[in-house]
Amino acid sequence: MSTFLQQLVNGVTWGSVYALIALGYTMVYGILRLINFAHGDIYMLGAFMGLYASRWFHAAQDPSPVKALLVLLTSMLLSALIGMLIERLAYKPVRKSPRLSALITAIGVSLLLENGGVLVFGADPKFFPQLIPQKTIALLPGVAVSNQQLIVLVVSIVLMFALRMFVLHTRTGKAMQAVSHNHMAASLMGISVDRIITITFMIGSALAAAAGVLVALQSPKIEPYMGIMPGLKAFVAAVLGGIGNIPGAVVGGLVMGVAEVMVTGYLSPTYRDAIAFVLLIVILLVRPAGIFGKAVTEKV
């Protein structure tokens, strides 16, 4: 029983990371009906932005929670700006083109960020500094959690709650809901659709960057291709929960994290990545719209 509870704790921790990344996928899809396959690479850039921010604030030499928070916020801000540039330069010109054009553009942006990362950061892995010394906290006999895992959980919950409050209780959030329902109607009501789309990309990029920094706190080795598999798994999590549905992305991320850790612990680490695609196949066969998604019939 203690082994199961320990794996559950580990799974929820990883699931919260997948949920943060999946939120970016689901928000962009909800607004644009676009799968932003470059989103996993924003997660990678967030980790590198955090690395350079930690050097700027000398967080490695004098670690503290305040400096760790500064590193996180700086990474989120810089990644949000990168997300804005990507939307303006890459996606906006093809917004009215066929969906295949946008999909090819997304793949191209992903390859550009990955190979650009190799040129800028180098192909060799970099090591993220230990901003917060690791401590282990016993929850139950045989069940423990590190303070870094708690930080991941708490920060993820705070960011998800803040996003929910933003979407439900601010003018911009309500405008995002309106745009997701109907671009033309929202525009006729005086909402700047371009502005809302840009804000959506910025928020999604900031959340992915936060996930990158949080993972780097636990697994300090970072490299330019680190976003490929987490990005794909987060996409599966978004589909699992119902892509375009914000609560669904959170639930899908948690399910993905728990399933991955359980398979690793009880079967073999060999199947750790495979479980994501098994879940994708199952959900597409059983419930294509996802757990919280609604089937929509397109008119021809």
Regions flagged by a language model, labelled:
Residues S2-V17, F166-R171, I197-A237, E260-D273:
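Inter-helical junctions in multi-pass inner-membrane proteins, predominant
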Residues F4-A53, L85-S101, L240-I246:
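Single transmembrane alpha-helix segments in multi-pass membrane proteins
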Residues L20, G24, L69, L73-L85, ...:
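Generic alpha-helical transmembrane segments of integral inner-membrane proteins
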Residues G30-A38, L81-D124, F166-G173, A178, ...:
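Short loop segments and helix-boundary regions at transmembrane helix junctions
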Residues G40-I42, S219-I246, G252, A276, ...:
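Glycine-rich helix-loop "coupling/hinge" segments at transmembrane-helix boundaries
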Residues Q61-V109, G116, V251-M256, E260, ...:
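Alpha-helical transmembrane segments within multi-pass membrane transporters and channels
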Residues P93-V94, R99-H169, I196, P220, ...:
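Transmembrane helix-bundle core of multi-pass membrane transporters
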Residues V143-I222, I246-G252:
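Helix-loop-helix "hairpin" substructures at the membrane interface of multi-pass membrane proteins
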